[in-house]
Amino acid sequence: MQQIRAIVGTQWGDEGKGKIVDFLAKEADVVVRAQGGNNAGHTVEAFGKVFKLHLIPSGILYKDKLNIIGNGVVIDPESLIQEIESLEKEGISTENLKISDRAHLVMPYHKILDEEQERLRGEESLGTTKRGIGPAYTDKTERTNLRVCDMLDEEEFVQKLRTVYERKNQILTHVYHKTPMKFGELLEQFMKYGEILKPYITDTIKLLNDSIKAGKKVLLEGAQATMLDLDYGTYPYVTSSHPTVGGFCIGAGIAPKYIQEVIGVVKAYTTRVGKGPFPTELLDEIGNSIREKGREYGTTTGRPRRCGWLDLVVVRYAVLINGIDKIALTKLDTLSGLPKIKVCVGYKYEGKVLDLFPASLRVARECEPVYEEFEGWSEEEIKAAKEYEALPKSAKRYIEFIEKETGAKVFLIGTGPAREDIIIKD
């Protein structure tokens, strides 16, 4: 493998990045999570078990890999500690986990504010996970948030908490009519978190760059995806960070010149959670069938995902923004059994055909997808195939069409949920 690889989601998240990272982590020495919080969820099936990871990189399932939670991640210590304990209970060591001392904290008031802000938006709600991620990033931008390193310095923590404590309580009590938080309880709680997490906390920027200089192979693991990026996604129905390659450099603390290969994870169909435009959405039995067969329910929230045909306008856009070199195609098996399969290649709007995703949500809502149709394949044919040439002709046509339309080669194909259900192409 190239020394530094970045794994990015090309759609609205839930593409199966966790499985791809888990597969590629075999060849890596270091796996890094660079942005987002516990609003994300990666599901990996290994050792006959299902692991649902929210903050910890998927490389943790390998004993000899260094796993880093970078400075761009916002961390809810309670959630992280629960995740660590859950892994340890299953016999998975977390000794090789390191947490950036520069990462920002999700505080209890962030979670309350997230929930109350969503409630007040009513029908205009954004569909957040209510985990406090947006408010934490807001405080980071306002330069009023607390960081992981502050949990290791009580004096510093007290000083920083005092500057925001009264204001947050005023908002909670006067605007949202909530019970005020108690300073002493917050302080005690986070000092306890700091003690538990202290062995994991370090300067990960130095650690990562020293690893690169030593020739270690690094995998940058994205959470969420391109269409949820704060700048490039379907704003305002986006996340509060940058799940694109540029965001990985900032959130991990490495220079862009080090990234040698960008891998885009593409689900063989499209899904999204929550509100926002979705041109290829299927509001029929086919959509329901894909949801049930693909187990399309949120790892973090359990919410049913909206399902639709593969949208190459979206994927093309992600390839352009991220400079994607190769594609890992996932969940090809979920489409098995459908007599006909459609792929969107453009959007028809006011007499024109758009080949890249528009900025305007009105255009995205009102456009008409332009489809190409393909013959389907059976589940037996997909399950029996262990190499590319053994795939049914119709599936190979589907894959080769994706390559032609996006300009990126497909090199991995997911044919089932298990770790070993992957075909290597070329």
Swiss-Prot record:
Main location: cytoplasm
Example GO molecular function: GTP binding
Binding site for IMP: 14-17, 39-42, 129, 143, 224, 239, 303
Pfam family, one: Adenylsucc_synt
Pathway(s) where this gene product acts: Purine metabolism; AMP biosynthesis via de novo pathway; AMP from IMP: step 1/2
Residue positions of the active site: 14, 42
Enzyme Commission (EC) number: 6.3.4.4
Segment forming the signal sequence: none
Entry binding sites for Mg(2+): 14, 41
Reaction(s) the record says it catalyses: IMP + L-aspartate + GTP = N(6)-(1,2-dicarboxyethyl)-AMP + GDP + phosphate + 2 H(+)
Cofactor(s) listed: Mg(2+)
GO terms (BP aspect): 'de novo' AMP biosynthetic process; IMP metabolic process
Note describing how the cofactor binds: Binds 1 Mg(2+) ion per subunit.
Keywords, alphabetical: Cytoplasm, GTP-binding, Ligase, Magnesium, Metal-binding, Nucleotide-binding, Purine biosynthesis
UniProt subcellular location: Cytoplasm
GO cellular component, one term: cytoplasm
Residues annotated as binding substrate: 299-305
Binding-site residues for GTP, renumbered to this chain: 13-19, 41-43, 305, 331-333, 414-416
Enzyme class at the top of the EC tree: ligase
Cross-referenced HAMAP family: Adenylosucc_synth
Subunit structure: Homodimer.
Function per UniProt: Plays an important role in the de novo pathway of purine nucleotide biosynthesis. Catalyzes the first committed step in the biosynthesis of AMP from IMP.
Family membership noted in the UniProt record: Belongs to the adenylosuccinate synthetase family.
Identification of the protein by name: Adenylosuccinate synthetase
